[in-house]
């Protein structure tokens, strides 16, 4: 009975290993030789295979391991495509590809991406995070908010009545004759001077007009008043 239980247990274990290794498609692949068996994530295989198209080495393992640009591209792909759980396994797979060659230039720590575009993008992102993290006292939001403030001046000018382009909008447009040579300003100045000259002309000319405002005017008024009083008294006596 013990032998039968042991055989059945081994059969179940073999079925489980076979199903996990071949039937179930996952993010891990089984790679190994006659004595060792290792699991590697799909991102490691994808980065190693797809990056070959950017080089001239094709399938030459010796050429791939000696190409520094290819190795940097593989590391950048692993750094961006593999998550934290699979990053160590993907890095181990990349290092293991060149263990049998004379050009073992892979290291345990991946280098920082040396491309200017990636470094510039990281710097801009860090600067933007600091800018917007410290508040909106300066930077792009404050600069863009200036446009509504400037445009608010236009409705303010027309508050309190209809739109008026200038303070002198109610004054009619001056008439310019075709035969006129001088400007309207010169004409108005000439008219004003003639008006001002009438006062001294009337005061300096010899005229008996000041005598009209003497006692003669009061005498005539008194005579008229006396006549009216006598007429009223006569009518009253008759009645």
Swiss-Prot record:
GO annotation (BP), single: biological process involved in interaction with host
Q: Propeptide at which positions?
A: 216-239
> Domain CFEM spans what residues?
19-125
The region annotated as signal peptide is 1-18
Q: Tell me, using the record's free text, what induces this protein.
A: Induced during infection of poplar leaves, with highest expression observed four days post inoculation.
Free-text comment on this protein's domains from its UniProt entry: The CFEM domain is involved in heme-binding and contains 8 cysteines and is found in proteins from several pathogenic fungi, including both human and plant pathogens. The CFEM domain adopts a novel helical-basket fold that consists of six alpha-helices, and is uniquely stabilized by four disulfide bonds formed by its 8 signature cysteines.
Record protein name field: Secreted effector CFEM9
């Amino acid at each position: 009975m013990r032998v039968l239980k042991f055989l059945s247990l081994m059969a179940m274990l073999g079925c489980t290993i076979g199903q996990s290794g071949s039937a179930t498609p996952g993010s891990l692949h089984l790679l190994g030789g006659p004595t060792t068996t290792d699991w590697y994530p799909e991102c490691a295989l994808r980065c190693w295979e797809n990056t070959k198209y950017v080089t001239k080495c094709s399938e030459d393992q010796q050429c791939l391991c000696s190409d520094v640009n290819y190795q940097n591209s593989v590391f950048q792909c692993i750094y961006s495509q593999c998550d934290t759980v699979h990053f160590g396994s993907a890095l181990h797979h990349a290092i293991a590809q060149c263990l049998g060659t004379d050009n073992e230039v892979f290291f345990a720590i991946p280098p920082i991406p040396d491309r200017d575009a990636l470094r510039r993008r990281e710097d801009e992102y860090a600067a933007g995070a600091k800018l917007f993290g410290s508040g909106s006292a300066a930077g792009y939001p404050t600069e863009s908010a200036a446009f509504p403030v400037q445009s608010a001046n236009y409705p303010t000018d027309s508050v309190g009545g209809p739109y008026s382009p200038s303070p002198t909008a109610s004054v009619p447009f001056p008439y310019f004759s075709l035969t006129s040579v001088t400007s309207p300003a010169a004409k108005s100045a000439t008219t004003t001077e003639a008006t001002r000259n009438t006062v001294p002309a009337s005061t300096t000319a010899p005229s008996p007009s000041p005598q009209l405002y003497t006692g003669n005017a009061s005498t005539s008024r008194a005579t008229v008043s006396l006549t009216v009083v006598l007429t009223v008294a006569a009518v009253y006596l008759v009645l």
